[in-house]
Structure formats: C-alpha cells, structure tokens
C-alpha cells in the first residue's frame, strides 16, 4: 500500500532552528572581536538551516565567512588589466589563518580543527562547519562594466590542490523563488523526501543514498506544476516526472553548474536513478 498522507505530512515538517541561529550568532561574535587586516568579512548561513530545508536530526550548521575586499574571477589577464585589477598581497591562505586564529582565540584551540574543506568548530550550541572563502566574480561574455558579474565564493582544498567555486546566495534566492512559485510546496517537499531518505537509510539503504544538496538540486529541476494538491499527489507527480526526465540536462539550484558530472561537487545520474528506485519501492512496499 502507498505511504499514508499523514506520514508524508509529518516528513514535510521543518526541524528546530533556534539552536542553529544561536550557533551562527556565536560564530559571528567570535569574528567580530578580531582585528581584520583587510576589512571585516561577511558572515552568513548556507545549507539546510539557511534554506529552511532542515529536518529533525540535522546537526552541523554551515557558516560562510567570506572576504569581499579580495576576489577571484574568470577574466583573462588582458581583461583584468583593462579593469585595473591588480594582484592582492593578502591571499586566501592569509585570510584562512586569520579566521582560524579568530575562532581559536574565542573558543580555544581544542574546539577548532581543520577539516578537508572547512574549519570544524565546537560551539556551546551545535557543531559548525565554517567555510573560509573569498568572493568570486563570474563575468558574462558581454560584460558592460567591472560591476557586471554573478557573485559566488571560492576556497582552496589543500589536500586536492584545487579551488572550489560555489554560489550559495544564488542557491538560496532561486530556492526561495521556486517555493513562492509552487505556493510554498517546494521546501516542504524537499523535507518530505529528505525524511523519506533518512527512513530508508535507517532500514538499511546505503548511507550515501541522496546527499541533501544533490537531492535539493534534483527537485529544483521538477516543473512547478508537479508540486501541490496533497503530499501523496506531490510524491507521485515528482517521482513519475523524474523517472521520465533527461537527467543530463539538469542544473544545480544555483543555476550556474550542471548537477551531474565527474567533478567532486557533482552527482552521478546512476545514483540519482538509484534514489528514484528506492522511492518507488518505498511507495509500493509501505507497511509490508
């Protein structure tokens, strides 16, 4: 029998946000005390707590610490000269060290450690993953001025010797817009599928069944008309549409990157199809 409407509705509920807000405020307080050599950085949430897609059990809070007085871009050397851009003597490595020092001074050395991509901070509230980044400017081919760019952020991964570029502000803005376009069904639907995934993992499904970011981006590509009515309607409409869709054309919620590909920040079509099969089996096998 299918999953009951009451169960799907429970799965759509948002998790608590108060402690995440206090975690964010704690990180901000730590950074406010520091004397920054190149101006105070911008501090903001990203991830499920920012996007209102957090569910019960979500723990780590993603906090972005972004330096805007220094930036990277996609311009050629000649284009940079034309705009008068010069190389900064204050690098991402310098900024990373300053952020690490600010957090260590506030929380203590035992509470701050380096992760692969983030600084892991144990606050008195929730653990925080602090992304230390600088502004990234993506200029279009026919740019009109130095201010004609799409804002992202970028950070270095030392263990892999590469830079990562992401667009968390666009991810948030596009998700908020889609939520409005679907009469506020989009974000509850994300939470419904996240909880369904968690339920399946608890029943023995693979731990990497559908990472939250990829799941959110997958659902972003579903037409607005497939959301709404009842949660049963939405579950079936979304899954049935995705099973027939050409996944190779899917974009991330930020609108800038392909969802599927070979880079570490991309998903695989095979794993997305696997997720859809698990959702199918959940729907048809509920209660058995």
Curated annotation (Swiss-Prot):
EC number in record: 2.7.7.-
Residues bound to ATP: 46-48, 194, 212, 265
S-S bridge residues: none
Binding site for Mg(2+): 60, 62, 129
Coiled coil location: none
UniProt remark on cofactor binding: Binds 1 Mg(2+) ion per subunit.
Necessary cofactors: Mg(2+)
Region (Disordered): 1-23
Recorded family membership: Belongs to the CD-NTase family. E01 subfamily.
Function of the molecule: Cyclic nucleotide synthase (second messenger synthase) of a CBASS antivirus system. CBASS (cyclic oligonucleotide-based antiphage signaling system) provides immunity against bacteriophage. The CD-NTase protein synthesizes cyclic nucleotides in response to infection; these serve as specific second messenger signals. The signals activate a diverse range of effectors, leading to bacterial cell death and thus abortive phage infection. A type I-B(UU) CBASS system. Cyclic dinucleotide synthase that catalyzes the synthesis of 3'3'-cyclic UMP-AMP (cUMP-AMP) from UTP and ATP, a second messenger for cell signal transduction.
Name of this chain's protein: Cyclic UMP-AMP synthase
Gene this protein is translated from: cdnE
């Amino acid at each position: 029998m299918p999953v009951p409407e009451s169960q799907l509705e429970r799965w759509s509920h948002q998790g608590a946000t108060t402690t995440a807000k206090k975690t964010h405020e704690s990180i901000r307080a730590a950074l406010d005390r520091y004397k920054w050599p190149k101006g105070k950085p911008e501090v903001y949430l990203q991830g499920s707590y920012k996007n209102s897609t957090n569910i019960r059990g979500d723990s780590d809070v993603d906090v972005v610490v972004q330096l805007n007085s220094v930036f990277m871009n996609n311009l050629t050397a000649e284009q940079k000269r034309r705009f008068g851009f010069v190389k900064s003597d204050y690098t991402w490595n310098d900024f990373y060290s300053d952020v690490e020092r600010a957090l260590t001074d506030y929380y203590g050395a035992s509470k701050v450690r380096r992760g692969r991509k983030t600084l892991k901070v144990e606050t008195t509230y929730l653990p925080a993953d602090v992304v230390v980044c600088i502004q990234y400017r993506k200029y279009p081919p026919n740019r009109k001025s130095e201010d004609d760019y799409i804002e992202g952020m970028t950070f270095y991964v030392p263990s892999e010797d590469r830079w990562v570029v992401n667009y968390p502000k666009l991810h948030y803005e596009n998700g908020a817009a889609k939520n409005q376009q679907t009469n506020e069904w989009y974000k509850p639907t994300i939470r419904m599928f996240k909880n369904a995934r968690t339920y399946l993992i608890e029943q023995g499904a693979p731990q990497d069944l559908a990472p939250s970011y990829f799941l959110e981006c997958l659902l972003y590509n579903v037409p607005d008309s497939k959301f709404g009515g009842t949660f049963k309607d939405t579950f079936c409409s979304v899954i049935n549409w995705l099973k027939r869709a050409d996944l190779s054309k899917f974009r991330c919620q930020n609108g800038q990157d392909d969802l599927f590909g070979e880079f570490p920040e991309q998903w695989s079509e095979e794993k997305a199809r696997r997720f859809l099969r698990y959702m199918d089996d959940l729907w048809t096998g509920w209660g058995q």
